[in-house]
Amino acid sequence: MAQLEVFKVGGTLVVDVQADLFGLDVTRVVAPLREKGPYVSFPGLTPGVDFDGRRWIVRIQELASVTAGDLGPTIGRIDGGRDDILRAVDILTRGF
């Protein structure tokens, strides 16, 4: 498993935001990908990404730890936006 890989967990797409440095751990930190429509977008905190031909927002404020075995197979990878996603984690945890 690697940072920015996408999985489907219980019908929800999630992106792995955990550094690969901790790849041997039994858990991974993930954030859900949501359609912008029903979810509020906060500047800096909910970066937009393209995946599977659609535009999503990464809901960093919904971070969760998931057992790696519960993630299942990778269904893809987010190719851009890494810096924006990690900056959003900083905003959530440090306030800037």
What do the predicted segments below correspond to?
Residues M1-V6, R55-R59:
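Domain-scale selection of a single, long terminal region
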Residues Q3-G10, V15-P47:
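Compact nucleic-acid interaction/catalytic patches
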Residues F51-F96:
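C-terminal terminal-subdomain/extension
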